[in-house]
């Protein structure tokens, strides 16, 4: 049985969408697999994404934005989700 921690999907009125998914997974760093994405559904443009889906040149934990990909600190999935939500709120307010 899969231990899902978060499985959230929200579409905003401006046609942007936020998806947050995380589950316990022993094969991933911190024993958690996650992907958090905020994007424009009309254009497909990624506005913000956090994930640990692969080991990139910037480390296991990374942040994708319009300016590229960068490593990001990871303490725990709860705080990581809150940080993502805060960034989404800021980006959404400026759209």
Protein language model features and the residues they cover:
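The feature represents the first ordered module of a protein
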Residues: 1-60
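Aromatic-enriched hydrophobic runs in primary sequence
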Residues: 34, 50-53, 64-67, 84, ...
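Short helix/strand-capping connector loops at secondary-structure junctions
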Residues: 58-72
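Short, compact, well-ordered microdomains
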Residues: 68-95
């Amino acid at each position: 049985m899969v231990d899902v921690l978060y499985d959230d999907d929200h579409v905003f009125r401006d046609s942007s969408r936020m998806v947050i998914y995380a589950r316990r997974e022993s094969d991933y760093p911190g024993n958690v697999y996650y992907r958090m994405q905020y994007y424009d559904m009309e254009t497909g443009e990624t506005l913000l994404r956090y994930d640990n889906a692969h080991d990139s040149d910037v480390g296991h934990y990374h942040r994708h934005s319009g300016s590229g990909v960068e490593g990001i600190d990871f303490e725990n999935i709860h705080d990581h989700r809150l940080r993502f939500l805060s960034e989404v709120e800021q980006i959404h307010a400026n759209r």
